[in-house]
Amino acid sequence: MDRRYFGTDGIRGRVGRTPMTPDFALRLGWAAGRVLAPRGNGLVIIGKDTRVSGYMFESALEAGLSAAGTDIRLLGPMPTPAVAYLTRTFRASAGIVISASHNPFYDNGFKFFSAQGTKLPDEVELAIEAELEKPIETVDSADIGKAERVVDAAGRYIEFCKSTIPNGTAFHDLKLVVDCAHGATYAVAPSVFEELGAEVVAIGAEPDGFNINEKAGSLHPENLRAAVLAQRADAGIALDGDGDRLVLVDEQGEVLDGDEALCIIALARAGEGALGGGVVGTQMSNLGLELALKAQGIAFERAAVGDRYVMEMLQQRGWLLGGESSGHILCLDRTSTGDGIVSALQVLAIMQATGRPLSELRKVMAKFPQTLLNVPLNGGVARDALLSAKAVKEAVRAAEGALGGEGRVLLRPSGTEPLMRVMVEGRERRQVEQIAREIAEAVRSVADHAG
């Protein structure tokens, strides 16, 4: 059965356009209540990021769930991984996050978590879509769901985050700059690090409903770099709007992406005998990560892009650690989903345990130069036809020949936007950039003619 609304990371779109409308949110809440409540205790947790539209969608979801006879706990602005955690601790049937992650304020979305704090299985998402096609029928008045606000949600999550590093680990000698992207972590992230003893300089922590991710957070580390250098900080931590991504900056102002953070954590876990198997990356993971892990005898597998697929492969293998270069890191020995704060804590704890600065820890991996270009596509272009077009296949074949087995070429359509992503990596940056431009031009030419 084809999906109509759910993508690789829930439902997402421009506010005011289907499906991101109040009436859709009302129907979604009702449909979700009908499907999810019978699978557990009839309770659903709702959290959101700091977008102004979140309040509108929260009310609509609440009404729909209540009409289906489902009780609700409202967390208010709270990171996505906090919703996953609190869904588990409340023994709820499901959790819903109102967020569009790293997108601008005018987008929003709905992410769902199972009772275990993981993404919903495909069959459950399809069941919700099937219910969406039915007219809303409100339960009897005596059975209408009740909504309550959870006033101590932030404190519960802060304590959980602190519990993910060894007892006795403290950051009293660390000065940190934390960029909250004017998003859902603005209140909790600085508190986590401060309570562990660090001196914290918070930036991107003044949300107004419209500035989420605006020149801030993990997609815009330039402000964090400048602040780390100006403050002479030991490290910088950049989170995205909903708090599930992490980008780091070392004390010299150099940016570390998710691959580098994942490598640091993996090698430290392996050294402790606590890795629990291999590591899962994605098709976009840097070749340097794979080589660094394999040099230490650590198995490495690539999943499709998206933390959902990393999670699926980890579960299939029975492994505990995986992630994406974008900064989604899954530490399943600590939590059930990607968590930027928890991932940052793991790296900082390694810094403290080894006495090595971040600029030294990052040397465990030598990154290959990598270029990623996004080619906009018009609505009439079939993705499969584009990938199989003769001109595109010839450009890829020529690129692979030029790289000579010391690099990779990857073309993949975006799961959330009308884009074709062109990724090229190899040993020489100029060559990589030139090859990426040539392939992107071939894709653009075929797409334009198809439109």
Curated annotation (Swiss-Prot):
Record-linked InterPro entries: A-D-PHexomutase_a/b/a-I (IPR005844), A-D-PHexomutase_a/b/a-I/II/III (IPR016055), A-D-PHexomutase_a/b/a-II (IPR005845), A-D-PHexomutase_a/b/a-III (IPR005846), A-D-PHexomutase_C (IPR005843), A-D-PHexomutase_C_sf (IPR036900), A-D-PHexomutase_CS (IPR016066), Alpha-D-phosphohexomutase_SF (IPR005841)
Can the keyword Metal-binding be found in this entry's annotation? yes
Name the keywords, alphabetized.
Isomerase, Magnesium, Metal-binding, Phosphoprotein
Q: Which cofactor does it need?
A: Mg(2+)
The record lists the catalysed reaction(s) as: alpha-D-glucosamine 1-phosphate = D-glucosamine 6-phosphate
Q: Which GO terms describe its cellular component?
A: cytosol
Instruction: Tell me the residues on which Phosphoserine occurs.
Output: 101
For this protein, the record's Pfam families field holds:
PGM_PMM_I, PGM_PMM_II, PGM_PMM_III, PGM_PMM_IV
Which Gene Ontology BP terms does the record give?
carbohydrate metabolic process; peptidoglycan biosynthetic process; UDP-N-acetylglucosamine biosynthetic process
Q: Which SUPFAM superfamilies does the annotation name?
A: Phosphoglucomutase, C-terminal domain (SSF55957), Phosphoglucomutase, first 3 domains (SSF53738)
Q: What does this protein do?
A: Catalyzes the conversion of glucosamine-6-phosphate to glucosamine-1-phosphate.
Name the NCBIfam families for this protein.
glmM (TIGR01455), PRK10887.1 (NF008139)
Matching entries from HAMAP family are given as: GlmM_B (MF_01554_B)
Protein's name in the database: Phosphoglucosamine mutase
Native species: Thioalkalivibrio sulfidiphilus (strain HL-EbGR7)
Q: What is the lineage of its organism?
A: Bacteria, Pseudomonadati, Pseudomonadota, Gammaproteobacteria, Chromatiales
